[in-house]
A protein has these predicted regions:
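Stable alpha-helical elements in mature extracytoplasmic
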Residues: 1-4, 41-45, 49-52, 115, ...
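PDZ domains, with a preference for the canonical peptide-binding region formed by the helix
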Residues: 213-245
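Generic, well-ordered alpha-helical scaffold segments in large soluble proteins
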Residues: 145-156, 172, 183, 196-199, ...
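PDZ/PDZ-like domain segments forming the peptide/carboxylate-binding groove
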Residues: 3-6, 13-32, 38-58, 62-104, ...
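Long, acidic serine/threonine- and proline-rich intrinsically disordered regions
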Residues: 88, 92-145
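Buried hydrophobic packing residues in well-ordered domains
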Residues: 146, 182, 193, 227-236
Length: 245
């Protein structure tokens, strides 16, 4: 349980000290339970993580609405990296920290955007994107977190591969499927090409370049273009891939 919590809350920004102690005690007090029961406890922790993080993001969004430009000039210091810091003792302390984080992020955006309202809107979009990413977590994702936390206790070099990851691995090993020959990332809900792979279809076509955005994907099965805005990158990749040749 300690390994799982360390993996999902690496910066000590979601759970309080007492909450973590309770989770650990719960797992230790039920050491004689079967795998299914322990797995259920793990899922409960992950669902608590999702709900808490969503609530904190919503709190940040509400806090931003109350800020004025003059508020950004007050002097304040925060630890951006809290991995080695003690956990907060109360939820109110976590909320205060998230308010400071939102303020810091808004200042960083304003340095580039200059206009206060534009910066606020951009930050709100980022927070909405993070909320959507949370909503897009699947049971496979949660199960992978639990299993990888467990396997790392026995062998730090071993990892559990979810069905999605297994499929990717088999595709890469067999070379039976291919995509467009490009590395992708997500930027505010839009899948963007960050690098073209040498010898891949993208370079050969001459039609695709770095920083191109993918907002729709056409397939042989569907005559219409599928809108992939706000999709997970791995889902976009899955749709793009097709038989080699």
């Amino acid at each position: 349980m300690e390994e799982l919590i360390s993996n999902i809350d690496q910066q000590n920004l979601i759970f309080t000290d007492d909450e973590v102690d309770n989770y650990i005690s719960l797992s230790k007090n039920n050491f004689d339970l079967g795998d299914e029961e322990l797995l259920e406890i793990g899922f409960d922790v992950l669902n608590d993580y999702k709900e808490r993080y969503k609530a904190l993001l919503a709190h940040q969004s509400q806090h931003i609405n109350k800020l004025s430009e003059i508020d950004l000039f007050s002097s304040e210091r925060i630890h951006r990296n809290r991995k080695d810091q003690e956990r907060f003792n109360a939820l109110s302390m976590i909320k205060n920290y998230y308010e400071s984080l939102a303020k810091s992020e808004l200042i960083s955006i304003m340095i580039k955007e200059e206009e206060f309202e534009k910066s606020v809107n951009k930050l709100k979009k980022r927070l909405n994107r993070r909320l959507k990413n949370l909503d897009q977590l699947t049971e496979d994702d949660l199960f992978s977190w639990i299993m990888n936390s467990k396997t790392s206790l026995y062998d730090p070099h071993s990892n559990y591969m979810s069905p999605r990851v297994t499929e990717d691995f088999e595709i890469n090993m067999s070379l039976s499927l291919e995509g467009i020959g490009a590395m992708l990332t997500s930027d505010d809900g839009i899948t963007k090409i960050t690098k073209l792979i040498k010898g891949g279809p993208a370079i050969k076509s001459g039609l695709i370049k770095n920083n191109d955005q993918i907002v729709g994907v056409g397939t042989r099965e569907e005559s219409q273009i599928v809108d992939v805005r706000d999709w997970r990158v791995d889902e976009v990749v899955k749709l793009i891939r097709g038989p080699k040749g």
